[in-house]
Amino acid sequence: MSTSKKVVVITGASQGIGAGLVKGFRERGYQVVATSRSIKPSSDPDILAVAGDIADPQTAERVIREAVAHFGRIDTLVNNAGIFVAKPFTEYSQEDYAQVVATNMSGFFHISQLAIVEMEKNASGHIVSVTTSLVDHAIDGVPSVLASLTKGGINAATKSLAIEYAKRGIRVNAVSPGIIKTPMHGEETHAALGSLHPVGHMGEIDDIVQAILYLDGANFVTGEILHVDGGQSAGH
């Protein structure tokens, strides 16, 4: 068990933004606990992979327990796991609702609770969640009620937790992306999706990684919802 390096827990870490975050934090010298349903073991001794469904409280408990057992502490939690189901409001099924709420909200709630318990032991820590600019700026033709419901709730919880734990050394922030080039968006969609942003193009995974790394080192910033969205939240 090592306590000499900072330790970050990253959910949804197997691909896209999550995989970028694993790389970015390792380059900063962090020990990384990476979790997702499909995560594979790493040959890097400073990366601990823990497979499981983050919506399940038992997975959250196992991730935190193994993080502390292997690395001795938790400095940062990145709540990156999330799913997006785009449908007209009246076409959402009960299964859609349950799945999105479970991953986006339960996947935030349980592991954040447990991480804060560990952070309080050191009177220091940082939680940063990935939400969406659609919460603040709905787009015609992109039906997103479930994303707005769940990620909007996390934005609100971010501010509430930031105030609750401000005097206990724990900061809580969120990054609110626009549409990012990830494996979920085929290359044939990039031009159309890029046109939804005032800057005229989609964001890159590294845009989100760098925003999260900035927040992790910005000790005077808490309760912030940082929009990384090519101007979407500012208007059209």
Put a short name on every predicted segment.
Residues 14-15:
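Conserved glycine-rich cofactor-binding loop
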Residues 88-89, 96-101, 193:
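Substrate-binding pocket helix/loop in short-chain dehydrogenase/reductase
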Residues 112, 150, 158:
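Active-site helix of classical SDR
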